[in-house]
């Protein structure tokens, strides 16, 4: 569908912002949306991590719980470190936004980092759950599906990289 407005006049009291600044207002709303998506991705990552910690403590393999296997435990350490790093990136961007500072690049960084961390963590969570991670009886299956959209809407990861690199090379 397409909307066409010809000779359309908007009364001054109905303007959403200063005349001629609509693009800037629209872009500013993207920053807030991207922070929300970053928070969603971070929540998904944290939830998948928490589910996996509980599962690994309970699940026995070769006579011991999964959390006793060093390779798996080390991967969980990496997952936690990535989640914490993503949280700091998100909190920094949100703090800048709250203080009225420019936050377009930081919001893009937060969305990129949090969505990529969610992808990594949820993928490992499903893997560590084995076949159970793929069935609807376990929450990580839903988290696996829910995570993917965080890399797409309000700008794909590639668009976030364009925003960030554009700032680097301006």
Spell out what each predicted region is:
Residues 2-8, 12, 18-21, 25-170:
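Alpha-helical interface subdomain recognition
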């Amino acid at each position: 569908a397409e909307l066409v407005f010809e000779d359309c006049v908007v009364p001054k009291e109905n303007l959403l912002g200063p005349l001629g600044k609509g693009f800037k207002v629209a872009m500013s709303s993207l920053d807030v949306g991207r922070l929300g998506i970053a928070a969603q991705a971070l929540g998904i990552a944290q939830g998948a991590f928490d589910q996996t910690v509980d599962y690994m403590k309970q699940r026995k393999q070769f006579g011991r719980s999964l959390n006793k296997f060093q390779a798996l435990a080390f991967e969980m350490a990496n997952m936690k470190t990535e989640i914490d790093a993503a949280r700091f990136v998100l909190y920094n961007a949100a703090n800048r936004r709250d203080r009225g500072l420019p936050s377009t690049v930081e919001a893009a960084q937060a969305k990129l980092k949090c969505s990529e961390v969610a992808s990594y963590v949820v993928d490992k969570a499903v893997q560590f759950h084995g076949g159970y991670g793929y069935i609807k009886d376990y929450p990580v299956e839903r988290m696996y599906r829910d995570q993917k959209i965080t890399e797409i809407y309000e700008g794909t990861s590639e668009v976030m990289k364009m925003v960030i690199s554009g700032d680097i090379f301006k």
